[in-house]
Amino acid sequence: MKQFLALVGFVIASITTGCGQSHTVWLDDLDLTAMTQGNGVAMKNKSVDGKTLTIGGQTFERGVGTHSVSEIAIQLDGKAVSFTAQVGLDDEIIEHKTSAEFIVIGDGARLWSSGIVKAGDAPKLCSVSLDGVKRLELIVADGGDGPYYDHADWA
């Protein structure tokens, strides 16, 4: 049976076409120990400081809080359909003039970039096709002003 994966709202959803059933696995349910980041430890369902994920005044129950520069690689083996997430800098650092860039890489090619986001900006929607992609990388890069207070959320 052929299986497909769809990443939705920072989710990995497995849709089995033969049975007509779908199974959703949230990324925060996966092992994130291989994630690298510039400061602190990636947090599941919380900001990097352990608070509620909040971007531009909007809160999120699920996702991953990280700090630039960060990267997580996910092996998809060509079974993915799409990736969708809300991204931005967490409101916990809103008083700091900080910036970052969210980047999605598939098999070494840039699939999407947020451009530079700043503290206090509304969440940005990321939605990309992953047809045939074997390896997905989710990266948070410094926005050009140093990595200080770059508390970045994938929600």
Q: Where is each model-derived feature located?
A:
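Bacterial N-terminal signal peptides that target proteins for export
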Residues: 1-8
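N-terminal start and proteolytic maturation junction detector
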Residues: 4, 13-15, 52
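Bacterial Sec-dependent signal peptides at the C-terminal "C-region" and cleavage site
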Residues: 10-23
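Gly-Asp-aromatic-enriched flexible segments
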Residues: 21-155
